Amino acid sequence: MGESSSPDSLPRKNILITGLPGVGKTTLIMKLVTRLKALEPMGFYTAEIRERGERVGFELVGLDGRKAVLSHVNIRGVHRVGRYGVDVQGFDAFLKTIPFQAGETGLAVIDEIGKMECCSSHFRRLIINLLESDKPLLATVAMKGGGLIAEVKLREDVVIHELTPEKREMLLEVLTGILS
């Protein structure tokens, strides 16, 4: 971790956070977004949709507060991950409203690069474009998965950090230092 603290000087400017489900990846992303407001981050995170105490889907929450359904047990169609139907058209429409490449944006944020999100070819292209852009990408990525999930982990321009309960606070400080 003896890397420079400026993203511009890092050969690996893209930061991927992985870890077991429920370890706190989204919470870490949200804390980093709060600390890095000066970079005017653009992107989204994913939150559970719960009904009567049971998880029934996932929603997308833009850093600007907008929301859209990503998946739900009641969505029918060809795109399914487990018991959830994925609303690929709605996801694509949501993504197109986020100005990831706006001039004032200094950080792209994606939570997460996972199986549901990868149902969208638009999302897969967006991730490659963000990784190859001159702006840093801060993203969570599923621990397991093929295709894009595996591909992004092999790129030379990424640094992968595995989040564990023991490393939560330390990783928050390290990533704040690298990205600010």
Feature roles, as predicted:
Residues L28, L32:
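Hydrophobic positions on the alpha1 helix immediately C-terminal to the Walker A/P-loop
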Residues V33-V81:
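N-terminal phosphate/diphosphate-binding loop that engages ATP/GTP or pyrophosphate donors
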Residues V78-N129:
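Phosphate-binding/switch loop-helix module in NTP-utilizing enzymes
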Residues I17:
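Hydrophobic anchor at the beta1->P-loop junction of P-loop NTPases
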Residues G2-R12:
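Phosphate-binding P-loop
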